[in-house]
Amino acid sequence: MLEQTSYRVERISELIRRELTLLLKTTTKDPRLSGVMITDVLASRDLSSAKVFYTVTKEDRTVVEPILSKASGFFRSRLSKTLDLRHTPALGFIFDSASNTGARIEQLLSKL
């Protein structure tokens, strides 16, 4: 039973990631969010919350962070229309520093 639950959570996390990526591309009118990429989503076991990891290509992270936090209710309401869940998880946006570190390491290695 535990494996089925974790598989379901992983599947829903991936679905949330895909839907958020689509929402950022199609419905967000703020140009500062055009460089935001969703890298991963980790939903809690009870699906009450989800951590959304993102990176930024164009804008500064400090500019994008409060915008995403304010828009989390909008994203949650849009997700509720596409996800077939009783309760849509609350979204928390977290900057993904690991992907930036990886890009920096690749850049340094390419210089060698």
From Swiss-Prot:
Which BP terms from GO are recorded?
maturation of SSU-rRNA
What Gene3D superfamilies does the annotation carry? 3.30.300.20
Its cellular-component GO annotations read: cytosol
Return the SUPFAM superfamilies for the record.
Ribosome-binding factor A, RbfA
GO MF = ribosomal small subunit binding
Protease: is it a keyword of this entry?
no
Q: Does the keyword Disulfide bond apply?
A: no
Name the major location.
cytoplasm
* Keywords carried by this UniProt record: Cytoplasm, Ribosome biogenesis
Q: How does it assemble?
A: Monomer. Binds 30S ribosomal subunits, but not 50S ribosomal subunits or 70S ribosomes.
Q: What does this protein do?
A: One of several proteins that assist in the late maturation steps of the functional core of the 30S ribosomal subunit. Associates with free 30S ribosomal subunits (but not with 30S subunits that are part of 70S ribosomes or polysomes). Required for efficient processing of 16S rRNA. May interact with the 5'-terminal helix region of 16S rRNA.
Family (UniProt): Belongs to the RbfA family.
Q: Which HAMAP family match?
A: RbfA
What is the name of this protein?
A: Ribosome-binding factor A
Q: Which organism is it from?
A: Ruthia magnifica subsp. Calyptogena magnifica
**Gene from which this protein is expressed:** rbfA
